[in-house]
Structures are given as structure tokens and as C-alpha cells.
Amino acid sequence: MSILKIARMGHPILLQPAAAIDPAGIAGDPVLQQLIDDMIETLADAGGVGLAAPQVYQGKRLILAIAPEGRADREGAPLHILINPELELTAEPDQVGWEGCLSIPDLRGAVPRSPSLRFHGFDRTGQPVTGAANGFFARVLQHEVDHLDGILYTMRMKDFRYFGFDEELKRLEAEARAAEGQRDDE
């Protein structure tokens, strides 16, 4: 297995729709199986929660998504490998939350997403997969499928006042918590 290089914002592959993968050939395609293994290793190495094939310079409809348990009010979800994923939103995309991206390092932005959805696609053996996702995992799936359609999270943002560097946003958050603590003491 190998850790793959991650494409950064500005590379044209991130703005192009990815090609569907023939479900009949999934299980018997050693190149695709190696790509999946390499993407799993790359995602783990980067410490991310999702990775789409275009982010590793492969214009294929393939994503990985996970929601680790115990990370700040998040329901956990195991690693999902989805080929040709399709999403059906079951609520309006009006829940705003912070997102980052391995292709846009060190930055975060507030993005509206649906808090719930149904998904279907194929697993790495070519078998159909269906399921439902809520909360953070629904957000991750929407973010990754956007990559397959050539959409970056910044393109979904409504207010660029809520966009900035991680370090700066963490500093502002800490200052706000400290100020709130002082008011509680008064």
C-alpha cells in the first residue's frame, strides 16, 4: 500500500465531474482494489474523515467516509467505501456547520448541508450498498460526493465572514469561551 499525494485547490481535477465505474468489474479489477487500499492508507495518514478519488488525482466515482466515535457530539459511523454513490437528501440543506478539506489545508468554512440522507452505491466487492446517514456522517458524505461532481465546499458557502484559517478560528473560539467564562463569574 502507498500513501498518495493529495490534490490541492487549484488543480483542475478537483473541478471536473468524475467518471462512473462499471459495477460488473469492481471485484476483479486489481488496479481499483489497489486504489481503494491506497486511499484507505492515505486517509488514515492524513487524519481525515473522508476522501474522494479526484483528491488523489483519479477521476473515478469512489469515496471513503468515516465518522469516528467520540469526536465532539458526533455519532460514529464505520469506514464506508462507496463506488458510484448517490445521495437522496431527506431534509433541507439548511444546517450550517464547519467543514475543512484535505485539498484545502488549514482552512475552514461554514457550509449549509442536509442533516439527514439516504445513500446507495456499491462496495469494493461490487455488491449494492444502501443506508441512511444523519448529522456529521451525512455532512461527510455530501462533502465527498460533491468532490465527485467537481464541487468544493467553498462553492457552497453562503457567507465568507465564516471562512478562515484553523489557527485563527481556534484562537477566536478560545477568546469567546474565555469571555463567556468571565461573564459567568460576575
Task: List where the protein language model places each region.
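Positively charged
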Residues: 1-186
